[in-house]
């Protein structure tokens, strides 16, 4: 049927009433730039209609025809839900004037639009496109402004055409804008000939997106472009699994599997990629293949570490006197290893302090701080996560912050781009703008990956002291590298390992029990037994370490619910949300995904007062405990005081940060999350894949955190996951109470299993190589003599 401004067609009984509208876009109320979901006001013969739907390319002032349904939204009232729409080219003077005056063309407002259309009438658009110099005939338009209007008008048309073209390949609005800005009109050629080029040039375009486009335009599976891009993608995927390089045989096998070609096809392209400096190949006992940015990042990290590593000649007796003074002031007695650590920071500019739980790392850090303060040195404390930084502040009494915040992460941060390029442009603090301090102390160093270490070192000047603290027996960082272990293994730095257990005091949160029970911390004791490969004590006679034998999944689930909801909150004097379930796996009946569904049902059941949002893998509900599962360096956060006023703000929420959903707003399509009871963050619905429920998390994700009470289900699972390091890391996350539920034999099997997956890194090798080069070349060699 022909379109009038508004009419409806009655459907069969029980179906929605289809309606047709035609009118001007008065203004855009809301738009989600990731998926194009838009709420707009449409002027239909002078009446305003609220229209919702996917309009990624629509601007104020445009004339559109729509087909859709009238619906009554429970919160926002009547609105028109678009099914299909069409942009109608302005075909009368009023339409042209309205479009030009809508703000769609920069520098043209309603008054100027009226003068332009009055002058050129129905020829207005033709003049702008074909004779733009004639715009200068209109009062208020210079020749320069005429050219600017024409360029803006043309770019608007070209961008819309490009974005609609790209949307046909499944590319969202935000990404389409990036592609258009990067390539302009050349994007059509690139899409048709080599869409894989976008993976090199544009953050957010990965191999899978490019590969889907390539299939649609008919590029074959054995294309050189495809294989080269696929090899780099395989190396980047390995990077996300923690590897800095891959052995050639594994790279060829993995890439061949991903691409559906043979390993020989992969190997044929490696030399070409090396010549183009995309990869670096090193021949040794095994042939190593690196993505070039990661190779140079590892080499530069090693060089910067060695450049910072300076030995000072100090009076040992003076340090001894200082230690004695600290002991007297603080009413403590340092163990010999703790004294050794304070001597170390007096003599060496890089010191590694390592040790398990309860070995006195915090006491030692405090002693170091007192020594540095006596020397008049400025000190900065930092940790990889907000939780770890908060614990560091509480333990030392000195302000600690995340490493990202110390390095002043900027709003343009893009880690994916930086990893591809091998730089750290996301931080304001760098070689050109270094940190102004004398000493940096980093805690939870096992979580620091190669990228973050490289960025930190770039922001340090020679003469700055670096103390790194961590437990080398925990799992390595989620990101690439194994920095702490590699630094220790290299033998190039002063390492002090604390091995005497001090934390045996009675934990104050527990009520007094039978005097016959051991008053020591069995969490600490058993953690050290696990590290040594010895059986743990499972007699349940302690106040903080419990084991409950259960033989099937349903029994384990029942006990988990009982412990978290009913038993432990009163025993440890915390809220159920402060009790953390840690599991080795993501999948399976006792994996993260299933456990979160179960615990959500019992800890935060449905309620008329709680709004919900369905997502691809379940739903979020107001009051849910959630975790950020990928780094987002651009997202903004605010801290508010009790009166609701903003007292601080910044950018960045990081992998592993936990919070509570405080609001779900269907109108703005945003979810509000409160992290660490301080930082408020709003997530567009399109970004909800960055969050997941966190009643249960993997042990790996828990690293760097500490919880009042931890519950761990250990029943059965693959040997590659159920190993000693994983168990040790999980046990050491518990501060006041740990309960393991499951099979005793599997627990003992984990203690004996030391076969954790190898991480392919060569930082230790680089440190040895560069240090040996420096020793072999004397001062004359350095001068080229």
Predicted regions and their residues:
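C-terminal accessory regions
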Residues: 647-650, 655-785
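ASCE P-loop NTPase helicase motor core
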Residues: 339-342, 347-540
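Acidic, low-complexity intrinsically disordered tails
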Residues: 2-14, 27, 413-433, 762-785
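Accessory alpha-helical DNA-binding modules that contact the DNA backbone or grooves
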Residues: 37-45, 50-51, 59-287, 343, ...
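Conserved helicase motor core of P-loop NTPases
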Residues: 473-651
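Short aromatic-glycine-enriched beta-strand elements
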Residues: 30-42, 667-673
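Structural detector for short beta-strands of small beta-barrel domains
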Residues: 17-32, 68, 658-662
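Pre-P-loop entry segment of helicase/translocase ATPase cores
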Residues: 167, 236-237, 281-340, 412-413
């Amino acid at each position: 049927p022909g379109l009038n401004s508004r009419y409806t067609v009655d459907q069969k009984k029980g179906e929605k009433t289809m309606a047709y509208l035609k009118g001007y876009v008065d203004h855009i109320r809301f738009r989600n730039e990731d998926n194009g979901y838009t709420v707009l006001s449409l002027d239909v013969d002078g009446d305003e209609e609220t229209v919702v739907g996917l309009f990624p390319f629509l601007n104020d002032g445009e004339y559109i025809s729509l087909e859709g349904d009238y619906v009554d939204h429970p919160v926002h009232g009547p609105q028109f839900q678009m099914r299909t729409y069409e942009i109608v080219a302005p075909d009368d003077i009023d339409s042209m004037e309205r479009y030009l005056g809508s703000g769609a063309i920069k520098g043209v407002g309603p008054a100027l639009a009226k003068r332009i259309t009055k002058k050129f009438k129905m020829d207005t658009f033709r003049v702008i496109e074909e004779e733009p110099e004639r715009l200068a005939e209109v009062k208020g338009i210079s020749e320069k402004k005429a050219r600017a209007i024409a360029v803006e008008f043309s770019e608007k048309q070209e961008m819309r055409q490009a974005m609609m073209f790209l949307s046909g390949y499944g590319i969202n609005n935000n990404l389409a804008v990036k592609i258009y800005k990067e390539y302009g009109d050349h994007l059509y050629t690139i899409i048709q000939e080599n869409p894989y080029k976008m993976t090199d040039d544009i953050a957010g375009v990965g191999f899978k997106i490019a590969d889907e486009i390539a299939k649609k335009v008919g590029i074959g599976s054995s294309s050189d472009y495809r294989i080269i891009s696929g090899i780099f993608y395989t190396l980047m995927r390995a990077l996300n699994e923690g590897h800095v390089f891959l052995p050639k045989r594994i790279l060829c096998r993995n890439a061949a599997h991903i691409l559906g070609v043979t390993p020989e096809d992969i190997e044929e392209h490696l030399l070409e990629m090396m010549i183009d400096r995309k990869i670096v190949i090193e021949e040794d006992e095994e042939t190593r293949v690196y993505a070039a940015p990661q190779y140079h990042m590892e080499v530069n990290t090693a060089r910067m570490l060695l450049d910072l590593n300076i030995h000072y000649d100090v009076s040992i007796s003076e340090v001894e006197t200082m230690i004695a003074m600290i002991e007297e002031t603080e009413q403590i007695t340092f163990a010999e290893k703790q004294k050794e650590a304070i001597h170390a920071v007096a003599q060496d500019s890089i010191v590694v302090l390592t040790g398990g739980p309860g070995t006195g790392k915090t006491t030692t850090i405090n002693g170091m701080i007192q020594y540095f303060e006596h020397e008049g040195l400025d000190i900065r404390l930092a940790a990889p996560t907000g939780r770890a930084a908060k614990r560091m502040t509480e333990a030392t009494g000195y302000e600690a912050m995340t490493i990202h915040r110390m390095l002043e992460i900027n709003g343009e941060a893009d880690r994916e781009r930086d990893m591809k390029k091998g730089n750290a442009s996301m931080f304001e603090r760098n070689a050109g703008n270094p940190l102004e301090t004398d000493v940096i102390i980093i805690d939870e160093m096992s979580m620091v990956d190669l990228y973050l270490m490289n960025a930190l070192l770039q922001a340090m000047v020679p003469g700055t002291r670096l103390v790194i603290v961590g437990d080398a027996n925990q799992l390595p960082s989620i990101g690439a590298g194994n920095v702490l272990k590699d630094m220790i293994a290299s033998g190039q730095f002063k390492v002090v390992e604390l091995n005497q257990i001090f934390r045996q005091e009675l934990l104050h949160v527990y009520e007094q029990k039978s005097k016959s029970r051991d008053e020591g911390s069995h969490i600490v004791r058993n953690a050290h037994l696990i590290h040594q490969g010895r059986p743990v004590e499972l007699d349940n006679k302690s106040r903080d370490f419990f084991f409950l034998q259960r033989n099937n999944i349903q029994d384990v689930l029942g006990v988990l619910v009982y412990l978290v909801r009913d038993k432990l909150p009163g025993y440890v004097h915390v809220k159920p949300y402060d009790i953390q379930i840690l599991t080795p796996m993501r999948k399976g009946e006792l994996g993260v995904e299933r456990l979160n569904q179960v615990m959500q049902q019992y800890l935060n059941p449905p309620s008329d007062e709680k709004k919900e949002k369905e997502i691809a893998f379940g739903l979020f509900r107001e009051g849910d405990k959630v975790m950020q599962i990928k780094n987002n360096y651009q997202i903004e956060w605010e801290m508010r005081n009790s009166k609701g006023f903003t007292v601080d703000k910044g950018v960045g929420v990081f992998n592993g940060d936990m919070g509570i959903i405080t609001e779900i707003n269907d109108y703005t399509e945003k979810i509000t999350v409160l992290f660490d009871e301080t930082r408020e963050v709003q997530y567009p619905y399109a970004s909800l894949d960055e969050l997941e429920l966190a009643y249960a998390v993997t042990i790996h994700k828990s690293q760097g955190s500490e919880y009042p009470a931890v519950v761990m289900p250990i029943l059965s699972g693959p040997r590659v996951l159920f190993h000693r390091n994983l168990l040790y890391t999980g046990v050491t996350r518990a501060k006041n109470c740990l309960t393991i539920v499951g099979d005793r034999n599997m627990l003992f099997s984990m203690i004996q299993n030391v076969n954790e997956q190898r991480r392919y890194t060569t930082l230790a090798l680089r440190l040895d190589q560069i240090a040996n080069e420096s020793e072999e070349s004397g001062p004359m060699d350095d001068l080229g003599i």
